[in-house]
């Protein structure tokens, strides 16, 4: 494990927190849609998309911390997930949104999250 500057350590902790928050947000959106929807669902989903964009802005710093091919591939995969998220707004039906969440967005995000956490945990777990 490499030594990190305080700012780098803080960045990884915040990044890990955001990863968990996004998971919770996706779970909330899926539940709300399955339960008949909520006026807040589009707002929460937009917040998830905004969080993805915020995370994407930190990826250059993350890549510098973990100067490894595996992490670079995960960061590229993250960029592709943003495309799945944007497809949400193209779906006209609740059924289409549920299908998109269950078959593409949530599974790909959760798999990505587990892989990224393998890099993060040595630095963020005490």
Q: Which ranges hold each PLM region?
A:
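Short terminal alpha-helical segments
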Residues: 1-46
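Amphipathic, well-ordered alpha-helical segments in soluble domains
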Residues: 18-25, 51-58, 77-84, 108
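A structural signal for long alpha-helical coiled-coils and helix-turn connectors
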Residues: 30-37, 63, 86-90, 120
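Short, charged, amphipathic alpha-helical segments
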Residues: 42-47, 72, 76, 97-106
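Short, solvent-exposed, charged loop/turn and helix-capping segments
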Residues: 51-72, 119
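Mid-chain, well-packed structural core segment of small domains
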Residues: 63-88
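Amphipathic alpha-helical binding modules
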Residues: 81-126
């Amino acid at each position: 494990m490499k030594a990190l500057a305080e700012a780098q350590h803080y960045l990884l902790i915040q990044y890990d927190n955001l990863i968990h928050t996004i998971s919770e947000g996706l779970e909330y959106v899926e539940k709300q849609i399955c339960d008949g929807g909520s006026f807040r669902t589009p707002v929460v989903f937009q917040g998830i998309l905004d969080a993805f964009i915020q995370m994407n802005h930190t990826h250059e710093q993350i890549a510098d911390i973990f100067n490894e091919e595996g992490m670079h591939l995960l960061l590229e995969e993250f960029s592709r997930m943003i495309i799945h998220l944007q497809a949400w707004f193209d779906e006209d039906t609740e059924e289409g949104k549920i299908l998109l969440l269950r078959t593409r967005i949530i599974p790909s995000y959760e798999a990505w999250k587990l892989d990224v956490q393998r890099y993060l945990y040595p630095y963020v777990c005490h």
